[in-house]
Amino acid sequence: MENTIEVVSNLSSNGLLLKSSIKNENIVLLDMHLDIGDLKDLKNYKRSFLKNIGYNVDVVDYGNKIKFLLDNVRNNKKIRIWSSHKNSNEYMTVFYICNLLEKYDAELYVVYSDEISSEAKSVGELDKEEIKNVDALERKLLKEEIIMYSKTWNSLLNDNSDIRYISFDNTIKSCSYDYLEEKILNELKKYNEVRVGKFISNLKIDCIIDEIDYSEYRHPSGVRFLQYDRRGGQGCGSGRQRH
């Protein structure tokens, strides 16, 4: 693992790797929240909307982390991305890294949590024992795959909608906050009273939504329903719970 740089896209994934034998200095945390918000500022390796989802700064600069990643690629280090086909932010990170490194002759590998356990819809839902033999869990991306994922990233970048999510056909789709809010509010009109967790569960069953994390998807103007979960609702995350 000494010659491997690990790329993770959220704190829970970062925490999992730190519990394993992977050294902290080999981990690059790109918590960019690629599944929401305007992507255009990423050309400068920045995100400028994250205060809306709990960050205490207006702009987060990832320039140093990207420089570290590129320096290691130039030094022929292996790059391993931790991801999931069932988590839009983690899956988007694969597309982003492929686009970033397409012009380099980089060795890119991916570990998908849902290929290790069907219940693990995010890397952070794995247990450290499940990633002991990580070299046996990874798979190398072919050049053709890197090019394909890079094109997917460019397509999503050009579309640049408010939300990017994994649809039921396992592809990344885009939609606006207004579109999603309208669908949710129309569904909400069917109820006189309903618990947040139950309502979200029904939305998923009725294919109104799928794996969208409502604790994060908050309209900049403050969509009322999308804030309920942040104030203590059960949320819509599924998979294995850790206490």
PLM feature spans:
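Short helix-coil junctions and helix-kink-helix linkers
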Residues: 198-212
